């Protein structure tokens, strides 16, 4: 079977119009008001200063604190953590955070009441736009790296899928947002979870095709030399 473009499969692996990756080791993105790679500047609440820290021990300590609050993290702070993990060389770990953030962002977008999310300046509208921006802008970097080792990627996505089977209380994670009735949450989440099943099947069955497409698009040459280091023991997924 002929594989569809990787961008279609994962929803975020293709470059956005006007986006170029000049340095594959550094994610250069700006998603207002949550993250600006120049600085970096971070505004996602409680963990902002630690995520922006120049000190690696301070950053790692922040990741440890976030892991302890894993079930209640919102998608902007999870995306920013993925970006910073990637930039600081914890790239395998960044894959897990990225796919977790993507899942949470898509769940948010699926279950927000769009009739009540408002317009520019309203928190619901801004978050809805942010999940799309994070996914599109960050995906080419982390997927560019992650798709270079499908055998490593598959169990990470399986973990994210397993953790996503239970819908969190979104009203506590996003207290100012109006969502669809809770009676609709499970069905919305099931559709999202099934999407990962389809992605996993494709990844397992089409490794050779994916590899060839990466070579043809220059992704293999651009990302294959990147390395990854481990977080201190006990902090991985």
Task: Go through each PLM region and give its residues.
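Hydrophobic/aromatic side-chain positions at a characteristic register within alpha-helices
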Residues: 70, 86-87
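N-terminal signal peptide c-region/cleavage motif recognized by signal peptidases
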Residues: 13-18
């Amino acid at each position: 079977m002929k594989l569809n473009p990787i961008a279609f499969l994962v929803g975020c692996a293709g470059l956005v119009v006007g986006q170029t990756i000049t340095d594959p080791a550094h994610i250069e993105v700006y998603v207002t008001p949550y993250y600006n790679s120049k600085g970096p500047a971070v505004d996602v609440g409680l963990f902002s200063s630690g995520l922006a820290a120049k000190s690696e021990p301070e950053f790692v300590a922040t990741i440890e604190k976030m892991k302890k609050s894993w079930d209640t993290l919102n998608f902007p702070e999870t995306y920013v953590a993925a970006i910073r993990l990637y930039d600081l060389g914890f790239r395998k770990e960044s894959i897990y955070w990225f796919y977790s953030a993507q899942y949470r962002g898509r769940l948010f977008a699926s279950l927000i009441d769009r009739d009540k999310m408002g317009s520019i300046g309203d928190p619901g509208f801004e978050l809805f736009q942010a999940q799309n921006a994070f996914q599109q802008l960050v995906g080419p970097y982390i997927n560019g790296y992650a798709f270079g080792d499908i055998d490593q990627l598959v169990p990470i996505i399986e973990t994210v899928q397993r953790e996503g089977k239970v819908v969190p209380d979104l009203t506590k994670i996003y207290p100012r947002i109006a969502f669809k009735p809770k009676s609709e949450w499970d069905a919305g989440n099931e559709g999202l979870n099934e999407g990962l099943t389809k992605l996993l099947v494709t990844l397992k069955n089409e490794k050779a095709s994916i590899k060839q497409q990466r070579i043809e698009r220059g992704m293999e040459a651009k990302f294959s030399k990147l390395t990854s280091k481990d977080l201190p023991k006990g902090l991985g997924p």
